[in-house]
């Protein structure tokens, strides 16, 4: 669920999804288009692609099992959908942590109209 994804992001980056990631670049937040702006935005692009593989699942609201221990996120057992959504969220949160050194405040609340270039495909 979105709330669980927010907790994973906070665990990995020490930043809240809102405001730091909800409207970042061209892909973080709802939807996405054109070319990712940087490594952080690319994490969101890959997360969107991961969700596209599970379109029959309720990616925004399905509650899944996971734990945050010893610096790691571990997804638990559940339905196929819940396990896949958890993995998408876990991988994205870890990606955002790895991208912290290149995070740019200037890409927060980035207007869609400034997203340029051809859209990438998953």
From Swiss-Prot:
Keyword Cell inner membrane appears in the UniProt entry: no
Any one GO MF annotation of this record: phospholipid binding
Top-level taxon of the source organism: Eukaryota
First-listed, main subcellular location of the protein, grouped into a coarse class: secreted
EC annotation from Swiss-Prot or TrEMBL: 3.1.1.4
Names of required cofactors: Ca(2+)
pH dependency: Optimum pH is 7.9.
SS bond partners: 26-115, 28-44, 43-95, 49-122, 50-88, 57-81, 75-86
SUPFAM superfamilies per record: Phospholipase A2, PLA2 (SSF48619)
Active site residues according to the UniProt entry: 47, 89
Catalysed reaction, written as an equation: a 1,2-diacyl-sn-glycero-3-phosphocholine + H2O = a 1-acyl-sn-glycero-3-phosphocholine + a fatty acid + H(+)
Assigned keywords, A-Z: Calcium, Disulfide bond, Hydrolase, Lipid degradation, Lipid metabolism, Metal-binding, Neurotoxin, Secreted, Toxin
Annotated function: Snake venom phospholipase A2 (PLA2) that produces neuromuscular blockade in chick biventer cervicis preparations in the absence and presence of crotapotin. In contrast, in mouse phrenic nerve-diaphragm preparations, the neuromuscular blockade is dependent on crotapotin. PLA2 catalyzes the calcium-dependent hydrolysis of the 2-acyl groups in 3-sn-phosphoglycerides.
Protein name: Basic phospholipase A2 F16
CC terms in the record's Gene Ontology section: extracellular region
Sites where the protein binds Ca(2+): 27, 29, 31, 48
Control of this protein's activity: Pre-incubation with heparin markedly reduces the neurotoxicity of this toxin.
PANTHER family, per the entry: PHOSPHOLIPASE A2 FAMILY MEMBER (PTHR11716), PHOSPHOLIPASE A2, MEMBRANE ASSOCIATED (PTHR11716:SF9)
Dependence of activity on temperature: Optimum temperature is 25 degrees Celsius.
Enzyme class: hydrolase
Transmembrane parts of this sequence: none
Tissue: Expressed by the venom gland.
GO biological process terms held by the UniProt record: arachidonate secretion; lipid catabolic process; negative regulation of T cell proliferation; phospholipid metabolic process
Localization terms from the record: Secreted
Protein family per UniProt: Belongs to the phospholipase A2 family. Group II subfamily. D49 sub-subfamily.
């Amino acid at each position: 669920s979105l709330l669980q994804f927010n907790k994973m992001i906070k665990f990995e980056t020490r930043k809240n999804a809102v405001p730091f990631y909800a409207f970042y670049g061209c892909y973080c937040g709802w939807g996405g288009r054109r070319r990712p702006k940087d490594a952080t935005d690319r994490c969101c692009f890959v997360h969107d692609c991961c969700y596209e593989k599970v379109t029959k699942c309720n990616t925004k609201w399905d509650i899944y099992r996971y734990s945050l221990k010893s610096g790691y996120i571990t997804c638990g057992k559940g339905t196929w959908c819940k396990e896949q959504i958890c993995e998408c969220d876990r991988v994205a949160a870890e990606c955002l942590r790895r991208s912290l050194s290149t995070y740019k405040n200037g890409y927060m609340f980035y207007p869609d109209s400034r997203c340029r270039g051809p859209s990438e495909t998953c």
